[in-house]
Structures are given as structure tokens and as C-alpha cells.
């Protein structure tokens, strides 16, 4: 019996040695993935005028209330300014959603984490994402959600929110699909220093 117990003990010890252990998520290092995308920032920037037209047009600046029978009309909305820091975030996020179409980033966390990585100060923030629309006007029409009920107008409410004073927009073409991102925010200091629109094809590290 003593020998049997010893054999069993050795078996269990051996089993404990070879059993795989689950690693904690915060112990796993994200492995960067490099993808080649084609940016389309010249066209992406044209969406700013479309947003501001909706914000300042009394016929367009509305959204459904939760009862889906009455509307909230957004009066006296100011035009959004284009923020080139937010554009940088939107471009990064556009590449990320090409890998994982979600507001959660491929490496975990959310879009707002990118703001911190880019040292962007902000108050309120919101994000719209879209895929497959080939032109700026098409994606803007989808985000407007004119014919959707309250539950389907989240993108529209971002576009018409009085909490935001600026926006940056990103557009990439990857693996045959167009991806679009709008980053809205309230910023005490908006970066309006224009940079050349990036319409190049380049390798992007998503990490």
C-alpha cells in the first residue's frame, strides 16, 4: 500500500507539472501586427461639411426620442471644427477596425485609450465606425440614420451632440473593404493646424 500511495503521489505531482496554467490577461504582451492599408484622408475630410450642414439645418438637426413618436430638435448647434489630433486617432482606429470591427480595440481597451497614448486632452468623446461604404457621401448617409428609430440613431446623436466641439475622420482601404471612423470630442484646445492629407499606401503597426 505504501508503494501504491507513493506511485499515486508521484503521478499527481507529475500531473501538476504538466497541466497548462491560464495566464492572466494583463500578463500577456500584445504582439504588434503589421498590415498594409491605403489611406483616403482627402475624401474623409469632406465629411466635415456634411456633418456641419446637418448640425445647422433645422430640417436635419433632429433625432427620435425613446418613444419613437416625438423628436428632439437640436437648435443653435455650433459647427464642429476639424481637429488634426483627432484625425490621427481616427486614422489609427480605422486600421484597427480593419482587423477587428468593434469599438473595442484588437489589443483590448477602447478608443479612448488611444487618446491617452497620443497625449490628447479631452472632455466628452464619441466614436462612429463604418465599413463597406465606398464614398464619403455614402458613409455619411448611413451615419445619419434618417429612417431609423431611436435605438438605431446612436451615430446620428453623436453627429448632433452639443457636447462636442470638434471631430477628426479616418478612412482606410484594406483587403478590398473601405473602413471609416469619426472621432468626436470636446477639447479646450483644438488642434486646427492643417497637415497634408494622407492618401498613401503604407504599413501600419496595430498593437
Regions found by a protein language model. Give the residues of each.
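Bacterial N-terminal signal peptides that target proteins for export
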Residues: 1-8
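Hydrophobic core
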Residues: 12-17, 55
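Sec-dependent signal peptide cleavage junction
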Residues: 17-27
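Short, well-ordered surface patches within globular domains
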Residues: 26-118, 156, 162-167
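A well-ordered secondary-structure block
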Residues: 92-96, 103-188
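Short, compositionally biased P/S/T/A/G/V-rich stretches that sit at domain boundaries
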Residues: 186-206
